[in-house]
Amino acid sequence: MTSGPLTTNNLNDFHVRGWVKLRAFSTEDAVAMEQVLWQRLEKYGVLREDRSTWVNIHAAGLSQRARQHRLFREAITAELRQAVDQLLGEGWRRPKDWGSLLFSFPEVDPRPWDVATSMFHWHMDPLQNIDRVRSLICFSFLSQVLPEGGGTLLVEGSHHVVSKYFAELTPELHAQKSKVKRLRFYQYHPWLKELTTGKDLDNRSDRFMADPTDVFGYPLRVVELTGEPGEVFITNASAVHATSRNCADRPRFMRVLGLHRDPDLADGALTNKSLRETT
């Protein structure tokens, strides 16, 4: 296995939970990228100094134009590159830039923050990592994202259950449309069904985030991705994740990036078995 910044404990966390957190770029670069976004948002009437303009607009082309900026293409740490080497092998495909933009402004909705309900909020990229880690999704922070501040929700441990589900599908079920297979997955276990059907609970946060629940022998729990400018969560692409509401007092600025093992190269990615053997 390639050496790098991820320790045995880090690799164990990635195997068990489906994520590991480190630094994607410097705090200074993150602050500079956030400033670029504010400058671009001014063209849509959104002003940093005027909270009354902080509305969740459909800013067509904003992400694409911002990603052409030098910082968005070049600002990355050796730590992140080396960590991806450890997880995917050195033959992963380098992207042209380091991710699409995710942004949301504080809501005026009086409802308290809670875990997303509808199954259409929850999604995953299941087929890449059934036998080994071939794809990652990286969620990085341009601004500070606090709890209940719009950070992505992730079901830690769910990549194991996703792999189990797809490995058990018959050829006939595999041939079904992706939407059908996804709907069947959310009926695969009572906990998943409860998470994604909007069943009324006094506090969904307590139910799904406080303590792990055993699902087919794997501890599953919803975690909220929060962090400081420049930090990144590297996640298994098969882990179930969802959007969440921003009930904080500040905007959320993040980037999301999929990284993939080059299928034309010899497969040097970590198998699920080799990840277990590092622990």
Language model: regions and residue ranges:
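Extracellular structured ligand-interaction cores
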Residues: 17-19, 133-139, 149, 222-224, ...
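A generic fold-level signal
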Residues: 14, 96, 133-134, 147, ...
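Non-heme Fe(II)-dependent double-stranded beta-helix
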Residues: 2-16, 22-129, 270
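Short, conserved beta-strand element in jelly-roll/cupin
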Residues: 123, 127-147, 226-229, 258-261
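Short, solvent-exposed loop/turn segments at secondary-structure junctions
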Residues: 26-28, 103, 144-147, 159-160, ...
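A structural signal for short, well-ordered beta-strand segments and their strand-loop junctions
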Residues: 21-24, 93-98, 137, 151-154, ...
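Non-heme Fe(II)/2-oxoglutarate
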Residues: 46-49, 164-170, 178-185, 189-197, ...
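A short secondary-structure junction signal
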Residues: 113-115, 120, 148-157, 163-168, ...
